[in-house]
From Swiss-Prot:
Protein purpose: N-acetylglutamate synthase involved in arginine biosynthesis.
Compartment(s) of residence: Mitochondrion
Record-given protein name: Amino-acid acetyltransferase, mitochondrial
Comp. bias intervals (Low complexity): 20-39
Stretches for region Disordered: 1-64
Pfam families in UniProt: NAT
GO BP terms: L-arginine biosynthetic process; ornithine biosynthetic process
Main localization, broad class: mitochondrion
Domain N-acetyltransferase stretches: 547-716
PROSITE patterns per the UniProt record, alphabetical: GNAT_NAGS (PS51731)
Origin species: Aspergillus niger (strain ATCC MYA-4892 / CBS 513.88 / FGSC A1513)
Length: 726
């Protein structure tokens, strides 16, 4: 992975960073874990005049560091960067998925500049971004584009066009940074620098909180913006830009700031700077600085960057208006909205989990919001401090999710307060509600591929440090570092922990269940997501063998052609549709569909061979809840949380008392099944492994034999009878 380094050329710096980024991702794809001796040299940008600096985990007084030469320091810093990437994407599948997303950015790349060609030699047809960030590797480097390629036939030269590379951006809100120590701020700055190097430009908004008057908050915000900017500048090959005068407010609507200058904001981002903003806006009539809500600033920036802030002229042709908005959206892709809050991710107070590691907004927003509101109401009621007019301003702060007083679900008498420190507890719940609503409001303006991450600055900073905080030696072997939630999410588009993992298989959690103050919250990954359809509705009628529906897959409420396509695409086999319908119709327990048939599960009630289905209680007691088909479209596998959404619906809503299924012994998905099942059993003389989520199954010998008999007896319904055991 060696490359030539030309110091002082900005384009060469971009070339090196692009190559090093792709090399890092490729290293993950090949499962390489060695980085010493193969890391490329780091380039210095003459524009900043900055010397190579040591990263946050190196001690400035370290004698071993001082003895290293410049090139050795460069290699050591690059090794640290690559190790962070290798640790964040732990599987080849995750790395390949990331590389595929990068490749998709350049399908249909346009034209290049005209150039004279020698006979038999043609130029590589690809554009060079004139305004690309010097740290982006979403596009190939200039030297790659300008390299001649051997070609027998001549290649027509496309016309010259000025094509700018699309800017990929993360919008970051850091809450109360004045309460963070320097080590945490430096760790956050290091992660932002790594994101920038990976091609994800960062725009940071400082949130000073609400403790203090307007003048105090404005002073704190400006000081903390300078502090974060200084921490970013201290990172190797990293530059910041603390920008004022980006936001403005009108006298008619002082609570709705808007972006004053799009160019002022995007210019430094395209130049590779990490932009830092304070939530300060200027009035339009008489220029005067006023403090605005950091959440309102985030929404204003989101609206502008999503291309939705334009005010079309009523006389303008609608087609031209649409083209202008589309052009703005092509300039920038706001991929992430990151909320760094000391509170951490969104906690959970129902079910076995203690925090939400993944939220599908389309499906879960209302339920989670109601749950948090009940917790707030319970804590406030216990302190006899519930306002007579209903909930406080948090219930009305988000115009996209109004929650009237009458909609608040009454607190059951048996429900106790969730925190011993009720003043602290209510304020913390308000913070979680605001984070949830801010994520929902921002994602509502963005494409479905965008996402939000809610985590704590401490978790990001800790994962940015080397294990033990010691200065790493070139040949040192140490403890595996904690995965960085932001880097991991960029590479995998997934949360650190799968939401469908049983609690027993997650990292050990400390703290009491009924205390917000002591309850640790994992990082929460939020997607606008997809709707979830369950037929029949388990909340109206629980799925039981006695009340099983008279439902078939050819029911009008089911789109059978799309369901068949989902199964065939997922299994990569043709289904004998009529044979399959004959087998499952009459046994169907229900159907789970995620989104527009992007994923799904078909569940049935099965009887062991020899047991007659006569409708008796004895027959119903022997029925086995069975997962007949679990399918996810290939394009949705490995990312987006589709499988987790379907699996969670199955085990939490449809069959909370347990379900079983079977899989080929050599199925690569079995590892995923192993992690989510209560137990497994390899069927002798067959190529099947049985899985179940039923608690205590092995203690009930009759039920266990029924499960095994069902998994042995079901015949596949594939049209391509290749003789291969399914």
């Amino acid at each position: 992975m060696s490359s030539r380094t030309l110091v002082g050329l900005r384009s060469t710096t971009s070339t090196h960073l692009q190559r090093s980024g792709v090399a890092a991702a490729a290293a993950v794809s090949s499962s390489s874990t060695s980085s010493s001796g193969s890391a490329p040299r780091r380039c210095l940008s003459s524009a900043s005049g900055r010397q190579v600096q040591q990263s946050a985990e190196f001690s400035s007084s370290s004698k071993s560091w001082d003895r290293l030469g410049r090139r050795a320091k460069e290699k050591l810093l690059d090794r640290e960067f690559f190790l962070s990437l290798l640790n964040s994407a732990s599987t080849k599948r995750e790395a390949k998925s990331y590389l595929a997303r990068l490749k998709a950015q350049h399908q249909g790349t346009p034209p290049l500049k005209p150039a004279a060609k020698q006979p038999g030699v043609a130029e590589a047809a690809a554009p060079v971004s004139s305004g690309a960030s010097s740290t982006s590797f979403y596009g190939a480097s200039r030297s790659v584009y300008d390299s001649p390629v051997f070609r027998h036939d001549s290649t027509p030269t496309p016309p010259l066009q000025d094509v700018s590379e699309r800017l990929h951006l993360a919008l970051v809100k850091i809450t109360t940074p004045q309460l963070l120590d320097d080590s945490t701020v430096n760790g956050v700055a290091k992660t932002l620098s790594q994101l920038n190097r990976l091609g994800m430009a960062c725009c940071v908004v400082v949130d000073p909180g609400t403790a203090g008057d307007s003048n105090q908050l404005r002073r704190i915000a400006a000081e903390q913006a300078d502090r974060i900017s200084t921490a970013v500048d201290a990172q190797p090959d990293s530059k910041s830009a603390h920008i004022d005068s980006v936001l403005s407010v009108s006298a008619l609507n002082p609570e709705a700031p808007k972006v004053l200058s799009r160019k002022l904001l995007l210019g430094p981002l395209r130049d590779g700077h990490i932009v830092v903003l304070a939530p300060i806006a200027y009035t339009e009539d008489v220029p005067r600085a006023v403090t605005v809500s950091a959440s309102d600033a985030i929404l204003a920036l989101t609206k502008e960057l999503a291309g939705l802030a334009t005010n079309p002229d009523p006389d303008e042709d609608p087609i031209r208006t649409a083209q202008r908005i589309a052009g703005l959206q092509e300039e920038v892709s706001l991929d992430r909205v990151i909320l760094l809050d000391p509170l951490g991710g969104i906690p959970a107070f129902s079910g076995p989990q203690t925090s939400h590691v993944f939220i599908n907004m389309e499906q879960e927003f209302d339920d989670i919001e109601n749950e948090l509101l009940r917790v707030w109401q319970s804590a406030a009621s216990a302190k006899n401090n519930l306002p007579e007019e209903g909930l406080p301003s948090i219930a009305d702060s988000n115009p996209l999710s109004k929650f009237a007083d009458t909609e608040v679900v009454p607190v059951p008498p048996s429900q106790k307060a969730y925190s011993s420190d009720l003043t602290l507890g209510t304020s913390m719940v308000e913070g979680h509600i605001n984070n949830l609503r801010l994520s929902q409001a921002a994602l509502a303006m963005l494409p479905s591929a965008s996402s939000s991450i809610i985590t704590s600055p401490l978790e990001v900073a800790n994962s940015a440090q080397s294990p033990g905080g010691a200065s790493p030696d070139v040949s040192a072997v140490g403890t595996r570092r904690q995965r960085n939630p932001l880097i991991h999410n960029l590479l995998t588009d997934k949360p650190l922990l799968s939401s469908s993992l049983p609690l027993s298989r997650r990292a050990a959690l400390n703290g009491r269940r009924d205390s917000i103050a002591t309850q640790p919250s994992h990082t929460t990954f939020v997607k606008r997501g997809m709707p979830l359809t369950i037929i029949p509705n388990p909340w109206l009628s629980p799925w039981t063998a006695k009340d099983r529906p008279r439902l078939g897959l050819d029911d009008p409420s089911i789109d059978l052609p799309r369901l068949v396509h989902l199964i065939e695409d997922s299994f990569n086999r043709k289904l004998d549709v009529q044979d399959y319908l004959n087998r499952v119709n009459g046994r169907l327990a229900g159907l789970i569909i995620a989104g527009e048939y992007e994923g799904g599960a078909i569940l049935t009630w099965e009887l062991p061979p020899g047991v007659e289905d006569d409708g008796s209680e004895a027959s119903q007691a022997r029925m086995v809840p069975y997962l007949d088909k679990f399918a996810v479209l290939k394009r949705s596998q490995g990312a987006g949380g589709v499988a987790d959404i379907v699996f969670n619906a199955m085990v939490r809503s449809c069959f909370p008392n347990g379900v079983c299924w079977r899989s080929r012994k050599d199925n690569p998905v079995n590892k995923w099944y192993f992690e989510r099942s209560q137990g497994t059993w390899k069927l002798s003389d067959m190529n099947w492994t049985m899985f179940w989520t039923t608690p205590g199954l092995t203690e009930d010998s009759q039920k266990f034999r029924d499960y095994e008999a069902v998994c042995r007896s079901i015949q596949p319904s594939w049209a391509d009878d290749t003789g291969v055991v399914d």
